[in-house]
Amino acid sequence: AAEKPLLLKSYHRLVDQVCAIYGGTIETEDNHDVLVTFDKPHEHMTHCVNALCAAQFFFGLYKAFNAQRAAHGKSNLSIQIVVHTGNLEELSSLTEKAAELSRRERQEHMVISRQVAYHPELQQRVLQANNCTPLASGAVSLARLSSDYQDLLDMQISHFSPDL
């Protein structure tokens, strides 16, 4: 229990690293939930591509960090990642939808909302059907991004993992 604040700080440092590379604004809630927004919509859904890459990069670092801690007999935390999209003027409802998906869909992989999973531009650029598992809620469990993106992310994860 005494270690939890230090663990949370370590995970937050990972979020900081990821957002320094992919952009995004970080907000930490009182309950330690972390919200990262990519608030500048760009042509070709680049902001969503950045959000997916950032989430997958964080997920890889998080898994590597947990594996390192487990190898030394140390505790770790289980984190759920949900990627959702919408108008930031409706941030409260977007956050609630993401939180609802997080509570409902406890998955080993990242969860992406229906709006992200079925967006034609994202399906064409970064999502491959064989990496996506439909969930009862209509959301999707995403194991990995398309190879062009995932291969780069895997290299980044390998590069940053030893220094965790």
Task: Name these PLM-found stretches.
Residues 1-13, 17-22, 164:
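Juxtacatalytic helix/coil linker segments
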Residues 21-25, 33:
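A glycine-rich, hydrophobic loop/mini-helix early in the fold
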Residues 78-84:
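Extended hydrophobic secondary-structure segments that form protein cores and membrane-embedded regions
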Residues 3-7, 29-76, 90-97:
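Short helix/loop segment flanking the catalytic signature motif in cyclic-nucleotide metabolism enzymes
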Residues 35-37, 82, 111:
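Short hydrophobic beta-strand segments that form the core of ligand-binding sensory/regulatory domains
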Residues 24, 89, 97-164:
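Intrinsically disordered, glycine/charged-rich C-terminal tails and inter-domain linkers
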Residues 16, 59, 102-103:
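N-terminal cationic-hydrophobic initiation segments that often serve targeting/anchoring roles
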